[in-house]
Amino acid sequence: MAEPQDMWRCQMVNCGYVYDPDRGDKRRKVPAGTKFEDLPEDWRCPVCGAGKKSFRRLSDEA
């Protein structure tokens, strides 16, 4: 599994989705091994539809 600094959590109030590069995003056809930074700019959270700007790196959370 990816290290926390490689995973990103959606910061929307009702979501909490975590993007894990080891898993990718099958719903949006993002292959496993795709870093968050390499996701297309129009990629959206598969749970709530939020854009990439709504995500924060897990290691940045206190």
UniProtKB/Swiss-Prot annotation:
Checking CDD domains in the record gives:
rubredoxin
Question: At the top level of its lineage, which domain of life is listed?
Answer: Bacteria
Report if keyword Electron transport is assigned. Answer: yes
Sorted alphabetically, which Pfam families does this protein's record hold? Answer: Rubredoxin
Give the keywords, sorted.
Answer: Electron transport, Iron, Metal-binding, Transport
Residues reported in the UniProt entry to bind Fe cation = C10, C15, C45, C48
Chain ranges of the Rubredoxin-like domain = 7-58
Kindly list the cofactors needed. Answer: Fe(3+)
- One GO BP: electron transport chain
Keyword presence, Signal: no
Q: How is the cofactor bound?
A: Binds 1 Fe(3+) ion per subunit.
Q: How does it assemble?
A: Monomer.
Q: What does this protein do?
A: Rubredoxin is a small nonheme, iron protein lacking acid-labile sulfide. Its single Fe, chelated to 4 Cys, functions as an electron acceptor and may also stabilize the conformation of the molecule.
Q: Which PANTHER family match?
A: RUBREDOXIN, RUBREDOXIN-1-RELATED
The entry sums up its family as follows: Belongs to the rubredoxin family.
| Protein name, per record | Rubredoxin-2
Species, as recorded: Desulfovibrio desulfuricans (strain ATCC 27774 / DSM 6949 / MB)
